[in-house]
Amino acid sequence: MAILPLADETWARQLPFMVDCFTYWILQKRKQLLQKKKNSDMKKTIVTCTIVAVAITGIWSCSKEIMGRTDNIPALNPSSTDINAGTWKPVLLTGPTDILVATPVATNSPDYIAQINEIKSFQANLTAEEVQIVKYWSAGAVLRWNEILRELVAKHNVPPYQNADGTYPIPNANNPLAYPTFPFSNPPFAARAYGYVSAAQYDALVTAWYYKTTYNRKAPYKVDSSLRVMVATSDLPSYPSEDAVVVGVSVEMLKLLFPGDQEYIQLKAEEHKRARIISGANVRSDIEAGEALGKAVAQKFVARAKGDRAGAAIGNQTIWTKLEDECMARGETPWQSLEIPKRPPMLPVFGKVKSFLFDSLTCVSLVPGPPPLVKSQQMKDELEEVYQQVIHTTREKTAIVHFWADGVGTYTPPGHWDAIAADDFIKKNYSEVRWARNMALLNMSLMDAAIVCWQTKSAYYSPRPTQLNPAIKTLTGVPNFPAYISGHSTFSGAAAAILGHIIPARASAYNAMADEASMSRLYGGLHYKSDCTTGLIVGKNVGNFAIQRAVTDGAE
């Protein structure tokens, strides 16, 4: 079975991205310093900053004790338990009673006392490694499993190499370890993965909260005060365990999406469950009930995923030819792959995938009008603008291009927005169920943005700037699908809209990030301005559907 690379190898893959981020920061500081004073002393300061940047890069690249950005964050300690979350509106379930959870044993029963003693036996022989494991998982179940999902996406975001005859092999979910390994987690695949996992986690936790208040069984440390408590304490009932619920639902969804990584996924699941018992947060029956609940909810989402038409998104030669012919029939120049040999377009039928936030007719209505005609003056002007941006690029613009590139080997643009959201959610001390609700709103927006975006790309099948003007040398890789509309812009518009609703104080910052992500594609020579501006608008229109759901889901 496939195993993820070791942590230091993972960070080695991410090092160029980290350097780009740091370079971007240095450039911002440089600009500020030059604006204040242009003299030799200031130049020395700038040189010093650059030396520091190089030194830090060297330390990162050589250290064998590299830590993740969130490895040392405090334990989740919610400012509110959201005790009434069992009444919140689920995504797929009709209500929490769709899943039955058995009545727990009483806390004074011999069975429960034996489970308390199991915790004590573990705590009597704790190792340093076990303490660290508890600390890691105490940061939050939704956060950690989102990070695991992002890592899996990055691992599998590698396009297959061509066959000897010039054709391209297709990953096979039924034989995931054969080359090319399944999946190729490109942006639309990734957006769908984030959407399904987050929505399923949310429904599972809403159901868990319903049964927590129904049975109201206290946490073990509330029953036996002699237990060592290694996590933040709470008045929230512990049955079923919210962490185990997230384990159960996440494992089943990830097994569907990443079938070749089941050994790694199960390893993380066992580690997570053990951490909750060792920490004194849950007895074993809390864990077992939670995991079973999570798995039951996951099966509802697995059934939906198997029928959402994503399996046909790759299309076939007949469909690919039809898209070209329809474009030429309109008098336009169809998109062509720039790879040698030509690679089929990336998931051209993804626009037919079943969305979460609206129906298929609404999806069609969200598709924007056509791009500028290839022979129009507007297109000539926009093409020239792309060329001028590339040949007159600056270090700052180049850093922006790389910061937002999110290409091969990364967790894709949707994963980048998940990371942005997670960093902000950590500071908010949300409960697990509110974490799940907010991530579901974000990731359903990103998934549905991908659907509308890809429907638009296939509808117009417009060429990339580099196809119309080979003199344009892009600053990052050219994606293998049509230009209009920009995927980065659409994802970013959707993310900024819903995140700005969730955290209004950050709305202007999210919009600024979305604008920068969008413009990065123009700076890099990958998109015309109309691809970017229209993509942002479409994304925000999609995000507004998530906002409509948010104001009616009972959580506000």
PLM features per residue range, with description:
Residues 14-15, 32-33:
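Cationic, low-complexity basic patches in intrinsically disordered or flexible, solvent-exposed regions
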Residues 2, 7-12, 23:
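Ala/Thr-enriched low-complexity intrinsically disordered regions
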Residues 51-56:
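Hydrophobic helical h-region of N-terminal Sec-dependent signal peptides
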